[in-house]
Regions:
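Hydrophobic or amphipathic, alpha-helical segments that drive membrane association/targeting
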Residues: 1-119, 172-234, 262-267, 296-299
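An active-site-proximal "capping" alpha-helix that borders the catalytic cofactor pocket
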Residues: 94-98, 233-250
Length: 299
């Protein structure tokens, strides 16, 4: 009885734990970004700093509520409800998948993004996104394999740390962009109004340089967090593939990955920069592993 439960129920997998590493790396910069917002309030009304991170985290708890999460993330991602012809493919596919996973059909929502990319992904804790191009290019069986893989991300809690990381990164992104904006303002003001004074010109240049440096620090933190997330997150793809195989969707998932390969996707990254930027293992590697798991299901 233990085997089926581990395949079908939500269970925190190892990659869900390792996915916390980039989130932890981002926390100091998140706190610094909130400190920049807090400072004016402290100067005016003396607000304690801890109010801001606590309020921000409490606000983020709203994303745990499925209806809010689906509506908010769906809007931010530009996702929509499936059209009638897409429902004809997705409804029976999702119904069968939910039955095999012993889940109510309504626990997770499937949405569509209009895109020419052959892609699908899980986000939040209740949302599965598939592109319109994928629904056009893949057979219903292959779509089922892809959905089984994405559902497996949710069942393994792989998306929890990713959602938290995105939420924490928002103040960092805003502060970095605001810093670059102020740098442009400082440079423009220096060029327009301080050219007559060497001292004012030097002061303006120093201010612009300082703002640029601060902005790049926050931007570098985001890049580093994304790179770490990609490195530790590739194991979650293998774990989701494994669970999809155990649910009985190994063959259609492998076929869907072959379609990705035929379209020129899922290639092995060349060079360290490409490896840091790659969020998924090579598609051929995944196909080989899936086929090996189907040949030796006990491993």
């Amino acid at each position: 009885m233990a085997g089926p439960r581990s395949e079908h129920s939500r269970q925190i997998e190892r990659s869900a734990i390792t996915a916390l590493v980039p989130v932890i790396a981002l926390v100091p910069f998140w706190l610094l970004a909130l400190a920049a917002v807090w400072l004016p309030f402290w100067l005016i009304v003396g607000s304690p700093f801890w109010w801001f991170p606590v309020a921000y985290l409490v606000l983020g708890l709203a994303l745990v509520i499925p209806t809010i999460q689906i509506a908010l993330l769906g809007t931010l991602l530009g996702a929509r409800k499936p059209r009638d012809e897409e429902v004809d493919v997705l409804r029976p596919t999702w119904r069968d998948l939910a039955a095999k996973a012993n889940l109510p059909q309504t626990r997770y929502a499937v949405r569509v993004i209009d895109s020419d990319d052959l892609n699908a992904f899980a986000c939040g804790g209740h949302l599965v996104i598939v592109t319109s191009f994928a629904l056009t290019e893949l057979t219903p069986e292959q779509v089922a394999g892809v959905l089984a893989h994405e559902l497996s991300h949710h069942l393994g809690w792989h998306t929890a740390a990713l959602t938290l990381g995105h939420w924490l990164s928002l103040p960092v992104v805003v502060l970095a962009r605001f810093g670059f904006f102020l740098q442009n303002v400082a440079s423009a003001a220096t060029d327009s109004y301080a050219t007559h004074s060497a001292a004012l010109t030097a002061l303006g240049r120093a201010a612009a340089l300082s703002l640029t440096a601060v902005s790049w620090v926050f931007l570098a933190a985001l890049y580093a967090s994304d790179a770490i997330s990609n490195l530790v997150g590739q194991s979650s793809e293998f774990e989701a593939d494994r669970r999809a195989v155990r649910l009985g969707y190994g063959k259609p998932l492998a076929e869907a990955l072959r379609v990705v390969i035929r379209h020129g996707g899922g290639e092995r990254p060349i060079g360290w920069r490409a490896r840091l930027a790659a969020s998924h293992p090579p598609a051929r590697t995944r196909v080989a592993r899936i086929e090996a798991m189907m040949r030796h299901p006990s491993r």
